UniProtKB/Swiss-Prot annotation:
This is tRNA-cytidine(32) 2-sulfurtransferase. It is found in: Cytoplasm. The gene is ttcA. Its cofactor is Mg(2+); [4Fe-4S] cluster. Binds 1 [4Fe-4S] cluster per subunit. The cluster is chelated by three Cys residues, the fourth Fe has a free coordination site that may bind a sulfur atom transferred from the persulfide of IscS. HAMAP family: TtcA.
Length: 274
């Protein structure tokens, strides 16, 4: 790729800045960390690797990057693409081979979405591998829009106010997951991926499943953003500004003990002079 245009340069700087802010805000990467960057071959994970490699050069701390891709034995998976790309970059990498494709096809009825089971199997395998190579952080390519979509999916279909945190300690206690692109929009990532011409690998297992609940939520957010620009960013900021006393979760706030404070100063409203 040649010299960047003004807009391309702004895009690159914006993604790097936002990723750097997210990493700093949530203390995602610390001095001496070994970061396992999970690559799927999609636009998000390629962008994440690209940004992290830059930050590795300019950050005031030292950390390792190890790229990992999981070959799930999907028919037609181009095994040569990622190794060739990573060798050209000079990045240490591992290809983890695990036939989760056959498991998913066997357990999920025809016509049903495979994403949930596929993701659980993949996550478990990657957690184990991260432990094996001594990775202290596991970086995933989820972005701001993914986080907002997950929030609505949980609210609409699971009756829970929870999303996809920028940083998470796994249930096993042995893995810390980070999402460096948590502040980045999908629109910017798509534009950056197009600009860099990353060798995208399509998902043959679930890429054609258009009637997913996530796609419905995504379409809803796209329409909201079209009518009210900035709404997705506003929703994301709301996830960073939670007021437990203004919700209804008794585990987060002790509503049962609320009583009048006899020592509080009364606030009188002079209704006659309104």
């Amino acid at each position: 790729m040649g010299t960047l245009s003004v807009n391309q340069n702004k895009l690159q700087k914006r993604l790097r800045r936002l990723a750097g802010e997210a990493i700093t805000d949530y203390n995602m990467i610390e001095d001496g960390d070994k970061v396992m960057v999970c690559l799927s071959g999609g636009k998000d994970s390629y962008t994440m690797l690209d940004v992290l490699l830059h930050l590795q050069k300019v950050a005031p701390i030292k950390f390792e990057i190890v790229a990992v891709n999981m070959d799930q034995k999907q028919p037609g998976f181009p095994e040569h693409v990622l190794p060739a790309y990573l060798k050209e970059l000079g990045v240490e990498y591992h290809i983890v081979e695990k036939d989760t494709y056959s498991v998913v096809k066997e357990l999920v009825p025809e016509g049903k979405t495979t994403c949930s089971l596929c993701s659980r199997l993949r996550r478990g395998t990657l957690y184990t591998f991260a432990d094996e190579i001594g990775a202290t952080k596991m970086a995933l390519g989820h972005h701001r829009d993914d986080i907002v979509e997950t929030f609505f999916l949980n609210m609409f279909f699971n009756g829970a106010l929870k999303g996809m945190p920028p940083k998470l300690r796994a249930d096993d206690g042995r893995n810390v997951v980070i999402r460096p692109l948590a502040y980045c929009s999908e629109k910017d990532i798509q534009a950056y991926s197009d600009m860099k011409e990353f060798p995208i690998i399509p998902c043959n297992l679930c890429g054609s499943q258009e009637n997913l609940q996530r796609q419905v939520v995504k379409d809803m957010l796209v329409e909201w953003e079209r009518k009210h620009p900035g709404r997705t960013e506003s929703i994301f900021r709301a996830l960073q500004n939670v007021a437990p006393s203004q919700l209804a979760d008794r585990n987060l706030f002790d509503f049962t003990s609320l009583k009048i404070d006899e020592n509080a100063t009364p606030r009188f409203l002079d209704v006659l002079n309104i």
